[in-house]
Every structure is written in structure tokens, then in C-alpha cells.
A protein has these predicted regions:
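Short, glycine/charged-rich "phosphate-handling" switch motifs in NTP-dependent
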Residues: 100
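Charged docking surfaces used in two-component/phosphorelay signaling
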Residues: 16-24
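Active-site beta3 strand of CheY-like receiver
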Residues: 45-51
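C-terminal output helix
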Residues: 107-116
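Active-site residues of response regulator receiver
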Residues: 53, 83
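Short hydrophobic/Thr-rich beta-strand motif most characteristic of the beta2 strand and flanking loop
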Residues: 26-33, 41
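Receiver (REC) domain active-site loop signature in two-component systems and cognate sites
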Residues: 56
């Protein structure tokens, strides 16, 4: 049975690129446009990993991760943050919220797949 990954990003084109790479690697994918959309799509669904942008309208990625970690069923689900910002303060904030990995945009799909496989496969 394939593992399911949720991609949360306000850029439809980025979601598409990530989705194609993940599906090509054998993962099932759910997409959401922001944190609010993501929380709604998680209702009654089990995902094994979440990839979330940091800067999004409505609910940013760090707020989304904080809300996600309040949900018992997702407390230990790994999260990879995507961002154009690579500052240490943002990284610390994301890690404090519960993110396990940080990928700076632009990135190559292979780079993302290494991080995904590392967090999903153990």
C-alpha cells in the first residue's frame, strides 16, 4: 500500500511539480492551497508526511504546522517545510513548530525525494 503525502502550497504549479515527482516515486498525493485547506482535507484521512510552504495566504505554513501538531492523529507526522527564506530565525521557528526538514526553493525534485524517503521509510 502506497504512503500518502499532503502537499500544501499556494502555488498550483509548484504543487504539480512536487506531485508528479512523488507519484513517480510511488506515493499517493493530496494537495491543498493553504493551511486552512490542508486542515480541512486531513479530516478522516491518514497521511504519512506533509510538505508545506512557509509563506501562504490565509494560514501560513508555520501556523499550519502548529495547528496540525495539536491534532492527536498528526502529532508525530513528519513535516518538510519549503521556503524561499533560508534564515536561521525562520528555520528555528519552523523546527519549534514541529518541522523535521527544511528545503529552500528553488530545489530539484531529486533533492526533495531524498528528504521524503528519509522521513517516510524508517
Amino acid at each position: 500500500m502506497a504512503k500518502t503525502i499532503l502537499i500544501v502550497d499556494d502555488s498550483a504549479s509548484l504543487r504539480q511539480v512536487v506531485s508528479i515527482a512523488l507519484k513517480g516515486a510511488g506515493y499517493d498525493v493530496i494537495e491543498a492551497a493553504d493551511g486552512v485547506d490542508a486542515l480541512a482535507k486531513l479530516n478522516g484521512v491518514k497521511v504519512h508526511l506533509i510538505i508545506s510552504d512557509v509563506n501562504m495566504p490565509t494560514m501560513d505554513g508555520i501556523t499550519f504546522v502548529k495547528e496540525l501538531k495539536k491534532l492527536t492523529s498528526y502529532k508525530f507526522t513528519p513535516v518538510i517545510m519549503l521556503t524561499t527564506e533560508c534564515g536561521d530565525d525562520k528555520k528555528r521557528e519552523g523546527q519549534a513548530a514541529g518541522a523535521k526538514a527544511w528545503i529552500v526553493k528553488p530545489f530539484k525534485p531529486d533533492q526533495m525525494l531524498v528528504a521524503v524517503n528519509k522521513l517516510v521509510m524508517p
